Swiss-Prot record:
NCBIfam families: PRK00124.1. This is UPF0178 protein Sfum_1097. It holds the Pfam family DUF188. Belongs to the UPF0178 family. It comes from the Bacteria. InterPro entries: UPF0178. It comes from Syntrophobacter fumaroxidans (strain DSM 10017 / MPOB).
């Protein structure tokens, strides 16, 4: 079990929470980015810096994540690749991507992208605050607990 983090766009409070969770539960966490990121030093936390370029971080995570791992990302196309592989995918706001909802999320994302490209006005990202941080924490804890139970820990 490993936690993969699409770290370029991950909010700082979520990164901090992941580091604390990894230390507390001794789960390896890997922060993947195409730029320098500052992550506290820890035996179970590491960073991987990939080259600049579109989708390079996503490709790295997709290649290395295995069934039973966790990935934290807001990239829906990446989630749509990982979920069928048996990777638990959570966005930084605490939404769990599943076999049941990933196709709909990808369809909405593609529609909104088409709308933006056609010059349509789409809403910007919602504000990120304590409520979102708590929802993420709750979802991550719940999913890790499920995984430990499946493994008999």
């Amino acid at each position: 079990m490993r936690i993969w983090v699409d770290a370029d766009a991950c909010p700082a409070p979520i990164k901090e929470l992941i580091v604390r969770t990894a230390r507390r539960l001794r789960i390896p966490a890997v922060f993947v980015a195409n730029k320098f990121i500052s992550i506290p030093d820890s035996a179970c936390v590491s960073t991987v810096r990939v080259e600049l370029g579109p989708e390079i971080v996503d490709e790295y995570i997709a290649k290395h994540a295995e069934p039973g791992d966790f990935t934290i990302t807001q990239d829906i196309p990446l989630a749509s690749v990982l979920v069928p592989k048996g990777v638990t995918v959570i966005d930084p706001r605490g939404e769990l991507y599943t076999e049941e909802n990933i196709r709909e999320r990808l369809s909405i994302r593609n529609f909104m992208q088409d709308l933006r490209e056609a010059g349509g006005i789409t809403p910007g990202p919602r504000q990120f605050g304590q409520k979102e941080k708590q929802r993420f924490s709750d979802t991550l804890d719940r999913e890790i607990t499920k995984r430990f139970k499946l493994q008999g820990n």
